[in-house]
Amino acid sequence: NIVAQPTEHQQEMVKALSERASLVHSGTVDPSQDNMLKITSDGRKLGLDQRIVNQMLPDEPGTKVNQCVDNIMQIWRDGEADKLTQLVFCDISTPQAKAPASKAAKTLDNPLLHALESTVPLPEQEPAFTVYDDIRQKLIAQGMPADQIAFIHEANTEVRKKELFSKVRTGQVRVLMGSTAKMGAGTNVQDRLMALHDLDCPWRPGDLAQRKGRIERQGNQN
């Protein structure tokens, strides 16, 4: 296990979470405005990366994500000759699918609807930060070919999923990232697996067993 020390920003934000919890327990906050479930959820996001909570915060060295990237790269280099593969599990900050324009336009008072009607271009929005994109960009920047990195979320049909799993088994795709729900049970890509990275901890203990079961299974050549 690799231990990442909290940044100063994370330490300050944890104090804020504690203050929120005190208010909730004292009954001075409307449960619809704040509650322990929200606080716990925010704590999980903060524990993964401070930029999930506020993407304007700096990308600091030594964080959980950056240590994971370094670890992935080292294993990737060491396993080059045998095309060894890795899985990265992360249930938080997953890739977000883009809604079709036609569907979004049907929503009342949707700004896209008004833009389509008046041909006024919408202002560009800064893409939301996701850990998945951040890791992929950093791996590529350090020399890993883009076609060796894949997100399970991109295989949105059974045919595509079957093709993706085949590429992982043969070592064409060497780093596969996904959530427990999408990459847990039924993901049989163990042939060349050398490492499994848990970036976060799922709610249910059984989900950790599902993750572990992707690599510790019959057919793993390592």
Spans of model-derived segments:
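Conserved SF2 helicase motif VI
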Residues: 204-222
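Short, high-confidence coil segments that cap the C-terminus of an alpha-helix
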Residues: 81-83, 172-173
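Phosphate/oxyanion-binding active-site loops and adjacent basic polyanion-contact surfaces
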Residues: 57-69, 127-132, 204
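A short beta-strand element within the Helicase C-terminal
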Residues: 187-201
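Conserved helicase ATPase core of P-loop NTP-dependent helicases/translocases
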Residues: 133-140, 145-180
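Inter-lobe connector of SF1/SF2 helicase motors
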Residues: 1-60, 64, 71-77, 83
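Conserved helicase motor "Helicase C" RecA-like lobe of SF1/SF2 P-loop NTPases
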Residues: 92-153
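Conserved RecA-like ASCE P-loop NTPase motor core of nucleic-acid helicases/translocases
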Residues: 84-92
